[in-house]
Swiss-Prot record:
Disulfide bonds: none annotated. GO terms for biological process: peptidyl-pyroglutamic acid biosynthetic process, using glutaminyl-peptide cyclotransferase. It is an enzyme of class 2 (transferase). Residues 1-23 form the signal peptide. It comes from Dictyostelium discoideum. It holds the Pfam family Peptidase_M28. Glycans are attached at N135. The active site is at E199, D251. This is Glutaminyl-peptide cyclotransferase. It is found in: Secreted. One of its GO terms (molecular function) is glutaminyl-peptide cyclotransferase activity. PANTHER family: GLUTAMINYL-PEPTIDE CYCLOTRANSFERASE (PTHR12283), GLUTAMINYL-PEPTIDE CYCLOTRANSFERASE-RELATED (PTHR12283:SF6). One of its GO terms (cellular component) is extracellular region.
């Protein structure tokens, strides 16, 4: 009996110790500040990324701009189309599939996670990176995360296509990834693109009926490790979240004259970078004349619920969403007819130059 008590006490001690260690490890990734240094793109690349690309985006929209409520046949077709657009020579594709309870019963959700590869790198989780002096760096490659949701909201009363919400953002991200493949191939940094499932509520928005995919993936990535090697070829494990420099979410894009504001002081420098790129492209007349500036250099408090929320405590987040929302939001008018080609092209150019400046 005496030994049994000792065994129980020792077991409880080790259980508590492990939990304390886990808490310490998780606290290390909370409240990160953005410290990204962007490089200036050559004029040839700026011109390349400023070329008209609406035809390519429309090609993607043709496949995505359908009713695509989570766990339906159309939804599966859209998922398969998105996956098919990423060349596996350049990208690793992971699917995060899981089941969750909804007001309409148990549903299956699938997040799509696409991550750029290094040249001749077959294993993302076992990476060697060389410094200029020839030594192997023990630092894992830094990662920029871009994201949007690919499901559409269920409405009993009408067919909802969700052009801005978020067929256009998904199409823009696919086009961006393909356009930047040559820069991605040479970059020492990683680009991760996440297509979230289950952003929309099936009935009324709540903590349990919304953000199904992002809530699941945010917790899953807490345990993800990136393995690098030191100069003695010994493995070093780092938390995935410690490698993420910023998490950017696109939503409700495509209607004319959107205005974007800063919602998060921690990513103010990223927002200002987008604003500066817009100004430079406007001066060069690479984007269309417009009534107002897209990226307004003003901070406003926001409690907008979206797929960035589950990641707030782990990585710096930048939420790119018009404020106020487009007047077609969650109506049957959020279809192809509400879209403005000039606005979509302009934003696409700005995002490409932003990401290109990060990768080089």
């Amino acid at each position: 009996m005496k030994y049994l008590k000792i065994l129980i006490i020792v077991t409880i001690f080790f259980f508590l110790l492990i939990n304390v260690i886990n808490c310490i490890d998780r606290k290390e990734i909370v409240q990160k500040e953005v410290k990204i240094k962007f490089k200036n793109l050559k004029s040839t690349l700026i011109k390349k990324y400023s070329e008209s690309n609406m035809e390519k985006i429309q090609k993607h929209l043709k496949h995505i701009l359908v009713e695509r409520v989570a766990d339906t046949p159309n939804h599966k077709k859209v998922r398969e189309y998105i996956i098919s657009q990423f060349d596996q020579l350049y990208w690793d594709i992971e699917l995060d599939s899981f089941k969750d309870n909804t007001p309409f019963g148990e549903k299956t959700f699938t997040n799509i996670i696409v991550t750029s590869k290094f040249v001749n790198d077959d294993d993302e989780d076992d990476i060697d990176t060389k410094e200029s002096n020839g030594n192997i760096s023990s630092e894992p490659p830094k990662t920029l995360v871009l994201s949007a949701h690919y499901d559409s909201k269920y409405f009993k009363e009408f067919k909802f296509f969700g052009a801005t919400d978020s067929a256009v953002p998904c199409s823009m991200l696919i086009d961006l990834a393909i356009s930047l493949q040559s820069e991605i191939k040479k970059s020492k940094k990683k680009l991760m693109i996440i297509f979230f499932d289950g952003e929309e509520a099936f009935k009324e928005w709540s903590d349990t009926d919304s953000l199904y995919g992002s809530r699941h993936l945010a917790n899953l990535l807490l345990d993800k490790k990136v393995i690098t090697k030191d100069n003695e070829d010994l493995p070093i494990s780092s938390s995935f979240y410690n490698t993420v420099e910023a998490f950017i979410l696109l939503d409700l894009l495509g209607t004319p004259n959107p205005r974007f504001y800063m919602f998060n002081k921690k990513t103010e420098s990223l927002f200002k970078k987008l604003s500066d790129i817009e100004d430079k492209l406007s001066l060069k007349r690479f984007i269309s004349p417009k009534a107002n500036k897209y990226f307004q250099n003003h901070f406003i408090g926001s409690d907008i619920q979206d797929d960035h929320i589950p990641f707030l405590n782990y990585v710096p987040t930048l939420h790119i969403i018009p404020y106020p929302f487009p007047n077609v939001w969650h109506t049957e008018k959020d279809d192809e007819s509400c879209l403005d080609k000039n606005t979509i092209e302009d934003l696409s150019k700005i995002f490409k130059i932003f990401v290109g400046s990060y990768l080089i």
